[in-house]
Design a protein with these regions (language model features):
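Periplasmic/extracellular, small/polar-rich flexible segments of pilin-like filament-forming proteins
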Residues: 52-122
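N-terminal single-pass transmembrane signal-anchor helix
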Residues: 2-31, 35
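Short alpha-helical interface patches
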Residues: 20, 36-42, 74-82
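Low-complexity, intrinsically disordered short peptide segments enriched in small/polar/basic residues
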Residues: 8-11, 15, 25, 43, ...
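Short, intrinsically disordered low-complexity segments
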Residues: 1-2, 29, 60, 66
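Aliphatic-rich helix starts adjacent to a transmembrane/signal segment
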Residues: 4-5, 32-46, 61
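Short extracytoplasmic/periplasmic juxtamembrane "stem" segments immediately C-terminal to an N-terminal membrane anchor
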Residues: 45-53
């Protein structure tokens, strides 16, 4: 009486191990590089906060000239944030005339940059 043997051959097992190795070699660099994605997201978050602060300030000052702050340079927007600009971030200086809209650049740690829109108000 012959017994039926079942299972994987050595070649099948080696092929599976090789395939797992190739997949790991492709996937691991993506997980290692998540730091740059996090820095870009942080800079974009700061830029979003700056854009919101600039828009709220513009609306408040248009409604009542005694409220809000004068914005005639991109760097003035940093003063509109509660607590100021986070440590390690800086805004590139760019003049803004009254009622003009410009695109400003904020630079974060490791030279990560993001842009935001600001409108000048006097």
């Amino acid at each position: 009486m012959k017994r039926q043997q079942s299972g994987f051959t050595l070649i099948e097992l080696v092929m599976v191990i090789v395939l797992i190795g190739v997949l790991a070699a492709v996937a691991i660099p993506k997980f290692v590089d998540l730091g740059s994605d996090a820095r870009a997201a942080a800079a974009a978050g700061v830029a979003g906060g700056l854009a919101s602060a600039a828009a709220v300030n513009y609306a408040a000052r248009k409604a009542n000239a005694a409220k809000g702050a004068i914005v005639d340079d991109c760097q003035d927007v940093a003063g509109l944030l509660q607590g100021g600009l986070p440590a390690g971030y800086e805004i590139t200086s760019l003049a803004i005339t009254a009622d003009a809209t410009v695109t400003c650049t904020v630079t974060g740690p490791n030279t990560t940059t993001a842009t935001f829109v600001a409108t000048g108000i006097s």
